[in-house]
């Protein structure tokens, strides 16, 4: 079994074989239990800081039966609110992104400042309990930022995000994820429960079938040069419930070199990108992994990859896959989360970037 040289197993290695009832994937009753006991108490990654850089910029995100507003404040901080007027429950906006000083209720015209305070209500003097502008605010949601992402928690007494993430906090800081730019984003409506999607990204058993190379020249290796054999993968589970898979990468079939074969794409392209000639490379197949690591160490800083100095050699080539409880996954450079349907346990949404 593969064991990373620089990444020890996370502390919780006691994986129990507990059967899972299929009703968890199609039961309305179980879906309601998730909304009662889980969703209101977990940290949810819902936004990206760079999407709302200036004061008054906001991002709206629907999640299951709830809708949230993430709003940049004058001091640069971000506040999050339920996207609902506190008067009669009307939705404040349907726009995914925007800029505003006030959120105006489309029903009775109440105006809420970007910091959540009510500043205008029609006929405010007619309310027997007094002017609502004196004491009403939008319902605020606990908010933190990390790695350039906006995280919210509906539980005001929830632990800090750093405590929730556990070992992921330090590992992600090394990548300087806060500097990442999003170039592609899409949302897919899925005819399945939200957990099925996460189950898929939480195991590598399907890779040899779904992602098998077109030319079956190797036992268990994807075209990208990622070794998908469980013997070459480190599986970890943290005490916080998050998972990590480390799959060795950056090399081709050893037999092809020994038999005078050639290094094929995409590995050949990766080598050329780092000034290694695949046609004149000598050595066994696994040696390309070390060669790419050394080339990235040498050339990376000159090309602007200054964060390479924060990374171990494995991180320069290998595939690090994270699944964060309950609904977020990072697979190479693809980030995705799943959102439950408001009413149907057999449906879900999958926004990704």
Regions inferred by a protein language model and the residue ranges of each:
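Non-catalytic accessory segments flanking enzyme active sites
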Residues: 18-69
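Conserved small/polar residues in nucleotide/adenosyl-binding loops
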Residues: 337-345
